[in-house]
Amino acid sequence: MGDSFMELDKGFRTAMGFAEKAIVPASLCVKFDGMSFEEAAIMEPMGVAYDLFMTADIRLNNDVLVLGCGPIGLMALQMAKAGGARKIYAAEFSSAAARCELAKKFGADEIIYTDKVKLEDYKFEKGGVDRVLVTAPPKTIGTACNVCNTGGIVAFLGISYNEPTVTFDSNVVHLNKLQIRGSNAIPALYFPLCIDLVKAGIVDVKSLVSHTFELENMPSAMEQYYKDKATALKAVMVKK
């Protein structure tokens, strides 16, 4: 790679992530003593979840809706709980049984099955929520705005390649003084903090690992992972 490789700044990106071994400047490495390799592998998506949590600016006693209970949504949910949220609603398809169960385990007060009820029709305790964390497709941003109380914040992440244009009622945003905020993290910057949160027991990432597989089994393992909608959460490649 040349001498310039040693001069790269923190957070650099280059091909080699799936190599069995890689040479990386010591200044770019973060120790994860006291954690398993499986837990350490989740620090990248956890950094994404942390940026979403910070973008939402959750305050004490806020009511929070987590829209989408994949690994990032479930980690952000735990952070919202630790950050002082009064009540947490988690929205997900009823077919994603494992995700819904973990949402309950991590502190969700109510689970909303979005394939059975429209969010706009759900009876929220305060009529709506103060913050919405959107990890579902961006097209749901309009729905998120519709269930926000006055002064609410909708924070979202995710890239939509097929439907990047979203629609929402501008009057709802204007009259209710809502904010729509995008989250785009540089996860590596949060690695030390995320490691501390896991070690302190504030965020449980071990429960998110639903599948493990070795490198040589990647094609078949990933195919099975995508077929297993009921229990699939996070797949981690390991070396036995």
Each model region followed by its residue ranges:
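Glycine-rich phosphate/adenylate-binding loop and adjacent beta-alpha elements
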Residues: 1-29
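Glycine/charged-rich beta-loop-alpha catalytic/anionic-binding loops adjacent to active sites
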Residues: 27-38, 176-177
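C-terminal hydrophobic helical "lid"/dimerization subdomain
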Residues: 142-146, 188-240
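Short strand-turn motif at the edge of the Rossmann-like AdoMet-binding core
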Residues: 158-161, 183-186, 213
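Mid-domain Rossmann-like dinucleotide-binding core that forms the NAD(H)/NADP(H) cofactor-binding site
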Residues: 35-116
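Structural detector of well-ordered beta-strand residues that form the stable sheet scaffold
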Residues: 30, 65, 89, 153-155, ...
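Glycine-rich cofactor phosphate-binding loops and adjacent beta1-alpha1 units
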Residues: 56, 60, 97, 101, ...
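Cofactor-binding loop segments of dinucleotide-utilizing enzymes, especially the Rossmann-like FAD-
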Residues: 69, 93, 159, 185, ...
